Curated annotation (Swiss-Prot):
Gene Ontology biological-process annotations: canonical NF-kappaB signal transduction; cellular response to mechanical stimulus; defense response to virus; immunoglobulin mediated immune response; inflammatory response; innate immune response; negative regulation of interleukin-12 production; positive regulation of canonical NF-kappaB signal transduction
The entry's keywords: Disease variant, Disulfide bond, Endosome, Glycoprotein, Immunity, Inflammatory response, Innate immunity, Leucine-rich repeat, Membrane, Receptor, Repeat, Signal, Transmembrane, Transmembrane helix, Ubl conjugation
Originating gene: TLR8
Name this protein carries in UniProt: Toll-like receptor 8
Signal peptide extent: 1-26
Cysteine pairings via disulfide bonds: C36-C49, C181-C187, C257-C270, C260-C267, C479-C509, C776-C803
The TIR domain, residue ranges: 878-1022
Biological role stated in the UniProt entry: Endosomal receptor that plays a key role in innate and adaptive immunity. Controls host immune response against pathogens through recognition of RNA degradation products specific to microorganisms that are initially processed by RNASET2. Recognizes GU-rich single-stranded RNA (GU-rich RNA) derived from SARS-CoV-2, SARS-CoV-1 and HIV-1 viruses. Upon binding to agonists, undergoes dimerization that brings TIR domains from the two molecules into direct contact, leading to the recruitment of TIR-containing downstream adapter MYD88 through homotypic interaction.
Length: 1041
């Protein structure tokens, strides 16, 4: 029995091991890129690994990758094995490693800078670009490949630049060494070995800005085209410094001897506030120069001789100096006939607030000038005569007069500019014009001495940006695209009179934001500029009390009225928006962040031309209140609307009727950042053109069972930042149009494969899942297999698709999860039925063996005998009349056999019976089994003296089977039972034998007077054949067969 169980257990274990090994083979390789996102772009293969919390270079990067971005990680070591096998790399970005900014989220990471083994990049023979910015490197890495053409070491701790580090890089074209020793670094000076750059004969760009140099490095290669020496503490530029740089096109010397007043960073001026000393012949060999930056060098005079040999100079930056006098005289301007951009911003005299601006007549010589920046000159009034020198410039298209605190301006002067496209007057003090008189409520004699800082107070500067020059577009590109632009934002035009813009009839883009305007527009204010197409009135206090507002602007296409909530918040004030219906060309209307919760008289918006409406940041939760049906159709009249933004409206639910009254022409619907717990998906059937549905930032708990039942046009579905915990099976079953599905930042613990399977060809190309608390058990394996089967579906930032449970998997990506111990459902079913079958069979076999063993054995032998027929065997010679089998270990039984049974059979007066006894007749030295077989075979009968104990012993069973074997082999029934105790009461064999040959079963009598009869009967049974005493009824029935 035990052996049978052992064998079945071993078989089961072997089967499980085989199944597990198959699973291991199937799961150990994943074809989806991880932890990086790999993509093809033109002829390049790019691996995007930035900001993935990596602590080492991943070994899973494909060997065909050409560009590898490892920036913003926690990598601390680069070794010779880091890029092994990546011989195709042409660009490596290791900027910001370790990422100190985000180190608090990984306290186990020690940040001592990036440690690079010598020669770690040497075997990358195709490497062209190597970016190692902000890595706390103490020196230039050694053993760099000669193939490098660009090397960036910005924001490190490199204080010594020697030939040993870069002399071998003969193919280098761009070298960035800026921001290594600047104002917040503990260093005294940057040491540059003499002639260190001399051997770099192909070098075209060299950046040494924000280092403590004190002088221009000597022996610079003549191949240089761009040289950045900003904020390098250089006080003197000699005639020899740039003598050999005949190919130089860009030179940045800004920040040397800086103007430090109001500086938003630690600033050290030159002694006595002196300006940088530039030799008059310092630039005489720079004949190819196109760009020169002398900003913040405390210049008070401009030497015209500097520009004598600069015939191609196009951009000149002179910001943050003391050049008010030079702007007035302008002798140097005569040397710049091809100058296109001139920046003279923030050259004001501290404490001075002149009435007018004074510019030189020599400005008229700048015939190629396209943009003039004069921010921060600081004056009170701009007259036509002041800009007379500029009016004849044929190419001038941009005038920047921002942050000048101008109070009055004669707009008529701008009519004299033939090609002017951008007029930037933001952040001044321009007041309303009423009856040709400027209204000023400011003290004209006062001047705000606190000039706005030229840079943000944020010390995290962009090392790649122009440190002093304002690089953002002056005007929104969307606005400037319509034509001539005027920016009057952040002024004091709190009232617009009919004559305000009478001298600017050709304005197409107008920005009047942040003027504290609380006017009731009546439809006449902009009559002088009827061709305006883009109007920005944001951040004012406009009162929409007149239904004719803005109707004079018949060509208006974009109207921005956002952040005018002042009067919309007041319930008792009239709120008219029906003026919108008067615009026949209006395409975009922005009413966001106005807290609109009530309208007057007319409750619906109407427009036949409007294409886009931004209604975010209002109070639709009140407008669509269950108890108020007036605004149910507020958007129904917008017949051609394609994009509607209803975000940030505090909506907890959307009435079905209100949703059905949205324009059927919608292609984009944004309902993000509300408080919706339920969304009626069935209503999407009313929008046959809807392509984008944005439901981000709500509290949705459930999704529809089948999206295809309600929309066939949807391409983008955004559901991030909700509370969705389950993705229904069949969610995308027949959706063929959906391309982008965003399920990030929800409560999904697992995703069933059936939820993403489609019956038709799917177009799904983007699936976002990061930020979900996935439960990484074997149930996630189904989704993992789907990921491997659908490589065309991009899952961005797989490193952020992480496990929340169980504890040992917490924080791991589901892609890195080891699922080899998991068994598939099919395999699990097969194993279950297999083990169930084996276990059941073993149990049934054990039960049958216990209950029906003899019956089976007997039937088997009867059948076998029937098949083989009767064969007479030669009978062995017998010496004994009977062999007595008894329990020799039982003293009472042994005594009964020797003194009673032997006496009455062998020593009786009647015919004696010769018995074979174990303790008397067995041969010494012969094996027990041999003695037993010999005793049974040499005796005519075998008598079993049975007790309860002996009937259970193996000795009895062995002797019984041997005696029974004679019946099979010799057809001789030799068995006789003497029952000293009632035993084998339920034995099928004993019951059958009692029916066939009852006399062969004797029981020791309880009555002593019956013992004589017992001995006589035993003697007769031993001396006669058993078959002569068979019950004829049974014998005859057997003989028939």
């Amino acid at each position: 029995m035990e052996n049978m169980f052992l064998q079945s257990s071993m078989l089961t274990c072997i089967f499980l091991l085989i199944s597990g090994s198959c699973e291991l083979c199937a799961e150990e390789n994943f074809s989806r890129s991880y932890p990086c996102d790999e993509k093809k772009q033109n002829d390049s293969v790019i691996a995007e690994c930035s900001n993935r919390r990596l602590q080492e270079v991943p070994q899973t990067v494909g060997k065909y990758v050409t560009e590898l971005d490892l920036s913003d990680n926690f990598i601390t070591h680069i070794t010779n094995e880091s890029f092994q096998g990546l011989q195709n790399l042409t660009k490596i970005n290791l900027n910001h490693n370790p990422n100190v900014q985000h180190q608090n989220g990984n306290p186990g990471i020690q940040s001592n800078g990036l440690n690079i083994t010598d020669g770690a990049f040497l075997n990358l023979k195709n490497l062209r670009e190597l970016l190692l910015e902000d890595n706390q490197l103490p020196q230039i890495p050694s053993g760099l490949p000669e193939s490098l053409t660009e090397l960036s070491l910005i924001q490190n701790n490199i204080y010594n630049i020697t030939k040993e580090g870069i002399s071998r890089l003969i193919n280098l074209k761009n070298l960035y060494l800026a921001w290594n020793c600047y104002f917040n670094k503990v260093c005294e000076k940057t040491n540059i070995e003499d002639g260190v750059f001399e051997t770099l004969t192909n070098l075209e760009l060299l950046s040494l800005s924000f280092n403590s140099l004190s002088h221009v490095p000597p022996k610079l290669p003549s191949s240089l085209r761009k040289l950045f020496l900003s904020n390098t503490q250089i006080k003197y530029i000699s005639e020899e410094d740039f003598k050999g740089l005949i190919n130089l096109t860009l030179l940045d010397l800004s920040g040397n001897c800086p103007r430090c007043f109001n500086a938003p960073f630690p600033c050290v001026p030159c002694d006595g506030g002196a300006s940088i000393n530039i030799d008059r012949f310092a630039f005489q060999n720079l004949t190819q120069l196109r760009y020169l930056n002398l900003s913040s060098t405390s210049l008070r005079k401009i030497n015209a001789a500097w520009f004598k040999n600069m015939p191609h100079l196009k951009v000149l930056d002179l910001e943050f100096n003391y050049l008010v006098g030079e702007i007035a005289s302008g002798a140097f301007l005569t040397m710049l006939p091809r100058l296109e951009i001139l920046d003279l911003s923030f050259n004001y005299i501290k404490g001075s607030y002149p009435q007018h601006i004074n510019i030189s007549r020599n400005f008229s010589k700048l015939l190629s000038l396209r943009a003039l920046h004069l921010r921060g000159y600081v004056f009170q009034e701009l007259r036509e005569d002041d800009f007379q020198p500029l009016m004849q410039l044929p190419n001038l298209s941009t005038i920047n007069l921002g942050i000048n605190f101008i109070k009055q301006i004669d707009f008529k002067l701008f009519q004299n500019f033939s090609n002017l496209e951008i007029i930037y007057l933001s952040e001044n003090r321009i007041s309303p014009l009423v009856k040709d008189t400027r209204q000023s409520y400011a003290n004209s004699s006062s001047f705000q001495r606190h000039i706005r800082k030229r840079r943000s107070t944020d010390f995290e500067f962009d090392p790649h940006s122009n440190f002093y020059h304002f690089t953002r577009p002056l005007i929104k590109p969307q606005c400037a695209a319509y034509g001539k632009a005027l920016d009057l934002s952040l002024n004091s035009i709190f009232f617009i009179g009919p004559n305000q813009f009478e001298n600017l009839p050709d304005i197409a883009c107008l920005n009047l934001s942040a003027n504290s305007n609380a006017q009731v527009l009546s439809g006449t204010e902009f009559s002088a500029i009827p061709h305006v197409k883009y109007l920005d009135l944001t951040n004012n206090r406009l009162d929409f009390d007149n239904a004719s507002a803005l109707t004079e602007l018949s060509d208006l296409e974009v109207l921005d009225l956002s952040y005018n909530s002042h009067y919309f918040r007041i319930a008792g004030v009239t709120h008219h928006l029906e003026f919108i219906q008067n615009f026949t060309n209006l395409k975009v209307l922005n009413l966001s962040h106005n807290n609109i919760y009530t309208l007057t008289d007319k409750y619906n918006l109407e427009s036949k031309s409007l294409v886009e409406l931004v209604f975010s940041g209002n109070r639709l939760d009140i407008l669509w209140n269950d108890d108020d049906n007036r605004y149910i159709s507020i958007f129904k009249g917008l017949k051609n609307l394609t994009r509607l933004d209803l975000s940030l409206n505090r909506l907890k639910h959307i009435p079905n009727e209100a949703f059905l009254n949205l324009p059927a022409s919608l292609t984009e619907l944004h309902i993000n950042d509300n408080m919706l717990k339920f969304f009626n998906w069935t209503l999407l059937q009313q929008f046959p053109r809807l392509e984008l549905l944005d439901l981000r930032g709500n509290k949705l708990l459930f999704l529809t069972d089948s999206l295809s039942d309600f929309t066939s046009s949807l391409r983008t579905l955004l559901l991030s930042h909700n509370r969705i915990s389950h993705l229904p099976s069949g969610f995308l079953s027949e959706v063929s149009s959906l391309k982008h599905l965003d399920l990030s930042s929800n409560l999904l613990k697992t995703i069933n494969k059936s939820a993403l399977e489609t019956k038709t060809t799917t177009k799904l190309s983007m699936l976002e899942l990061h930020g979900n608390p996935f439960e990484c058990t074997c149930d996630i394996g189904d989704f993992r297999r789907w990921m491997d089967e659908h490589l065309n579906v991009k899952i961005p930032r797989l490193v952020d698709v992480i496990c929340a449970s169980p504890g040992d998997q917490r924080g791991k990506s589901i892609v890195s999860l080891e699922l080899t111990t998991c068994v598939s459902d099919v395999t699990a079913v097969i194993l279950f039925f297999f083990t169930f079958f084996i276990t059941t069979m073993v149990m049934l076999a054990a039960l049958a063996h216990h209950l029906f063993y003899w019956d089976v054995w007997f039937i088997y032998n009867v059948c076998l005998a029937k098949v083989k027929g009767y064969r007479s065997l030669s009978t062995s010679q017998t010496f004994y009349d009977a062999y007595i089998s008894y329990d020799t270990k039982d003293a009472s039984v042994t005594d009964w056999v020797i003194n009673e049974l032997r006496y009455h059979l062998e020593e009786s007066r009647d015919k004696n019976v010769l018995l074979c006894l174990e303790e008397r007749d067995w041969d010494p030295g012969l094996a027990i089994i041999d003695n037993l077989m010999q005793s049974i075979n040499q005796s005519k009968k075998t008598v079993f003296v049975l007790t309860k104990k002996y009937a259970k012993s193996w000795n009895f069973k062995t002797a019984f089977y041997l005696a029974l074997q004679r019946l099979m082999d010799e057809n001789m029934d030799v068995i006789i039972f003497i029952l000293l105790e009632p035993v084998l009461q339920h034995s099928q064999y004993l019951r059958l034998r009692q029916r066939i040959c009852k006399s062969s079963i004797l029981q020791w009598p309880d009555n002593p007077k019956a013992e004589g009869l017992f001995w006589q009967t035993l003697r007769n049974v031993v001396l006669t054949e058993n078959d002569s005493r068979y019950n004829n009824m049974y014998v005859d029935s057997i003989k028939q067969y």
